[in-house]
Amino acid sequence: MSDIVLAIDQGTTSTRCMAFNHSGEPIAVHQLEHQQIFPKPGWVEHDPIEIWEKTQLVVREAIKKAGANPGDIAALGITNQRETTIVWNPKTGQPYHNAIVWQDVRTDKIIAELGKNDSQDRFRTITGLPLATYFSGPKIKWLLDNVDGLREAANRG
């Protein structure tokens, strides 16, 4: 049965894994919700360790429910949470901070500063995208500015 295809859907409120047979029919699914963290109004975070652990669990359970083994997996597709942003230590694999979720608006002041003096149009011209709290760039700036030791770690590579 080496023609199983897995799909991991790591979404805003849960992580699910579906197994499909050679004909593309779903044969198993397992899903687990994860905690939503709201440290301040407008801020939304997820625990990246919880997400990683639940991802591993849903994959194992979907394979088990499909009556398959890991060696039976022919392909894997992954979807993720849009612009949710995580930074981690490349040596330890540990996150420096909770994931900042795509709906989080803590970067509104960064966006306002970047958009002064008609820069909104400049950014759209260069990137094709508007300045918005949605995107990962402002989230990374916020993390570099606010997480103790992160900027120094980034500068060290």
PLM segments and residue spans:
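Generic structural marker for isolated residues within well-ordered, non-membrane alpha-helices
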Residues: 59, 111, 120, 140
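Gly/Ser/Thr-rich active-site cleft segment
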Residues: 2, 10-12, 23, 91, ...
